[in-house]
């Protein structure tokens, strides 16, 4: 249900119904989240097919959101005892190599294309010279970009890209999103280790940094203090992975099955959560009609 809740949010559905390539990115992000949950929840050991699936998902990420290929690195931080054998575990490195090779081939091909709709102030070679000549100014711009990333998630409450924004929708939806990230019963058969959580934070930071650097080179005027083009929708995959870091239900509930210990009726609880998600989607859709029509 956690995957389903994030799958029917307003902005991802709106963009998925358009021509934008981010629809592909949203689908892959949901598949990766579901796969990681499955790796920690299934009784069977992690096998070759699991590594192949993650390799395919992250390889496809190359063609839509390149920084997100870093998610393949999470596989090597899953505890060794979750794998069928050491040999299976070491195949993760082959998967990482395949993803990197595909990314390099794509970059080589993509570099041959010339954008025709960029501002005249954008020049990658001159921007690189500026970075090496003014490292302090570049690091300042990058730090500002990193610190402002959480604010960019407000974009999930806009009506068509970044043009119209609802403060009321944001404030009313924030507690619901927070409850899903922190309190939704996410009790997996196998514990998410601190090492995996640390690697998750590292991968998230890497994705944010690389995204900002790419847009500084390709979309920001030479020497400008603010990185242009960074949008909250680019970090949808990171939003999905937050429950692994923020969820505290293992400290609240005791036992392996929420129904058995009488804490709550999971079936009814899930129906309520799904209904809330549908109501938010309906409300945002109605607001969109009010804005544009």
Label for each model-derived stretch:
Residues 1-8:
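Transmembrane-helix signature of polytopic, membrane-embedded enzymes
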Residues 12, 107-113, 186-189, 212-223, ...:
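Juxtamembrane "helix-exit" motif on the non-cytosolic side of transmembrane helices
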Residues 18-25:
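Short acidic/glycine- and proline-prone juxtamembrane loop motifs at membrane-interface regions
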Residues 38-45, 70-99:
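Perimembrane helix-loop-helix junctions
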Residues 50-66, 71-77:
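Membrane-interface alpha helices of multi-pass inner-membrane proteins
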Residues 52-58, 84-109, 198-206, 272-277:
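Hydrophobic alpha-helical membrane-interfacial segments at the cytosolic entry of transmembrane helices
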Residues 104-187:
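Membrane-lumen/periplasm interface segments of multi-pass, membrane-embedded glycan/lipid transferases
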Residues 112, 257-293:
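Transmembrane helical bundles and short interhelical boundary loops of multi-pass, membrane-embedded
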